[in-house]
């Protein structure tokens, strides 16, 4: 399902601290040997996430672009995605063989969604640390994303989150749409996410 004029564009959204940057890092490292990969990160007033990915050595620095959205970060991925579309166009010019571009949104709320003009597939990341009730609270990120990632499952015992309850609620809220439990520190769940992108993205 790559875009008509370029690479598969994968939007990665979720609240602050859910693990979006850690997921982006792990996906880049898992896919960079087989595919030509790049990243666009969104921050309100800095390029902190882009700089973090460079430090993590997710990809060479020329493949990572940070955009400063100002104001509300969800505007840059939904109502007016032009700043991100321009960043992708610039990457395409510099790296014409791109297969995949990950677009990491700024930390936002459960209502954040990507414009279909910007993302071909969307991943929404939540953390068990936000409470076991998060999946049943719903919102477009929970119910409409192509893949829901429930991250930091290793911390569930420490924050009183019941993974079985979260699994039940995610199944109910998402109907047939898939979700994955993950632990980015140990890389658990990454293989399933890569498989999802490969199959659903037509890579």
Swiss-Prot record:
It comes from the Bacteria. One of its GO terms (biological process) is urea catabolic process. Keywords: Chaperone, Cytoplasm, GTP-binding, Nickel insertion, Nucleotide-binding. InterPro entries: CobW/HypB/UreG_nucleotide-bd, P-loop_NTPase, UreG. GO terms for cellular component: cytoplasm. Coiled coil: none annotated. Pfam families: cobW. GO terms for molecular function: GTP binding; GTPase activity; nickel cation binding. GTP binds at residues 14-21. It is found in: Cytoplasm. Belongs to the SIMIBI class G3E GTPase family. UreG subfamily. Homodimer. UreD, UreF and UreG form a complex that acts as a GTP-hydrolysis-dependent molecular chaperone, activating the urease apoprotein by helping to assemble the nickel containing metallocenter of UreC. The UreE protein probably delivers the nickel. Facilitates the functional incorporation of the urease nickel metallocenter. This process requires GTP hydrolysis, probably effectuated by UreG. This is Urease accessory protein UreG. The lineage of its organism: Bacteria, Pseudomonadati, Pseudomonadota, Alphaproteobacteria, Hyphomicrobiales.
């Amino acid at each position: 399902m790559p875009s008509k004029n370029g690479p598969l564009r994968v939007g990665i959204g979720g609240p602050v601290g859910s693990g979006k940057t850690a997921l982006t890092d792990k996906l880049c490292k898992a896919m960079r040997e087989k595919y030509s990969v790049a990243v666009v990160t969104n921050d309100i007033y800095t390029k902190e996430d882009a700089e973090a990915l460079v430090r993590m050595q997710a990809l060479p620095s020329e493949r990572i672009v940070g955009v400063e959205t100002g104001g509300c970060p969800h505007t840059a991925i939904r109502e007016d995605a032009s700043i991100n579309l321009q960043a992708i166009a610039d990457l395409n010019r510099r790296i014409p063989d791109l297969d995949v571009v990950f677009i990491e949104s700024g930390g936002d709320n459960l209502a954040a969604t990507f414009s279909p003009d910007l993302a071909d597939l969307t991943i929404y990341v939540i953390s068990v640390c936000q409470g076991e009730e998060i999946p049943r609270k719903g919102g477009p990120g929970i119910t409409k994303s192509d893949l829901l990632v429930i991250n930091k499952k290793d911390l569930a015992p420490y924050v009183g989150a019941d993974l079985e309850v979260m699994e039940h609620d995610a199944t109910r809220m998402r109907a047939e749409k898939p979700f994955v439990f993950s632990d980015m520190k140990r890389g658990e769940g990454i293989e399933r996410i890569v498989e999802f992108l490969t199959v659903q993205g037509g890579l």
